[in-house]
Amino acid sequence: MADRVKTVGWAAHDSSGFLSPFQFTRRATGEEDVRLKVLYCGVCHSDLHNIKNEMGFTSYPCVPGHEVVGEVTEVGNKVKKFIIGDKVGVGLFVDSCGECEQCVNDVETYCPKLKMAYLSIDDDGTVIQGGYSKEMVIKERYVFRWPENLPLPAGTPLLGAGSTVYSPMKYYGLDKSGQHLGVVGLGGLGHLAVKFAKAFGLKVTVISTSPSKKDEAINHLGADAFLVSTDQEQTQKAMSTMDGIIDTVSAPHALMPLFSLLKPNGKLIVVGAPNKPVELDILFLVMGRKMLGTSAVGGVKETQEMIDFAAKHGIVADVEVVEMENVNNAMERLAKGDVRYRFVLDIGNATVAV
């Protein structure tokens, strides 16, 4: 195919999800494109779901990855914001229509023509491959400026996990100093939700089924309180005390007990994605004027705002850096929940033979 450039990534070729070196092509650098050498890529749980086709729409070979930080190696002649050598980020999506109401209002995430960092179809009909690769080519609009004082690799998961928790806090008004926020789940999303909430000046209660996480939540992450959700005495005392709750848990679980923790007008925002329907007592919500909301990652403008906010307040993820030769072991550990709190792949230093 004309105007394609060879590169190398790590792809799954079937639903086993096993990742191996894979040579493929990306488009040549267009006039509005930024080409970057990938330095680091975060490992999101959705990557694991997708390489195993657990969502049902994976096409193989599949190069996953949507939390990418790299260094600019080439720019198109119409690119204005970046030059060769800049550190930049790439997140969950890499293109949108640019014209719909969502795009005009800087919430490209909800554009009906959104193109994801992998598994979407590019303009030339090829399948877009993700950040577990040596290079990427992205339109300038969807590339993020990376602050010099934001550490690598620990900042990398902000592009996915960070945006996922920051965006609903801003949209639903859960960013006002003095508010009381509950955070359900203390994983990759939850630990960043605690950090952002504390930077906003919120009182934070971590809600978990695991009593063993109390010390970590309070003494390491800075939460103000810890609630064991299976402890009836604790939950009784916490009823009607929270202005909002960010629920980061993807495993199916009951939501109604969480609503009891909210004050009247409180908001339960679900950012995890359970794969089973949930039951709601609508009358209970009506009587307390309580809201169930959802959210995905922020748009381009908001994600850049989040990155800059994180740099200003020293917010990064707690990460374990993984060499690419150990990527499949990392995926096995992720499936077991054996990570604190996020894996980041060291792609820049990887050597690969195809």
From Swiss-Prot:
PROSITE patterns the UniProt entry points to: ADH_ZINC
Keyword Zinc: yes
Reaction catalysis annotation: 3,17-didehydrostemmadenine + NADPH + H2O = (16S)-deshydroxymethyl-stemmadenine + formate + NADP(+); 3,17-didehydrostemmadenine + NADPH + H2O = (16R)-deshydroxymethyl-stemmadenine + formate + NADP(+); 17-dehydrostemmadenine + NADP(+) = 3,17-didehydrostemmadenine + NADPH
Keywords annotated in UniProt: Alkaloid metabolism, Metal-binding, NAD, Oxidoreductase, Zinc
Organism: Catharanthus roseus
Tissue expression remark: Expressed in leaf epidermis.
Disruption phenotype: Reduced accumulation of catharanthine and vindoline, but accumulation of akuammicine and short-lived MIA.
Record-given protein name: Protein REDOX 1
Taxonomy of the source species: Eukaryota, Viridiplantae, Streptophyta, Embryophyta, Tracheophyta
MF-aspect GO terms: oxidoreductase activity, acting on the CH-OH group of donors, NAD or NADP as acceptor; zinc ion binding
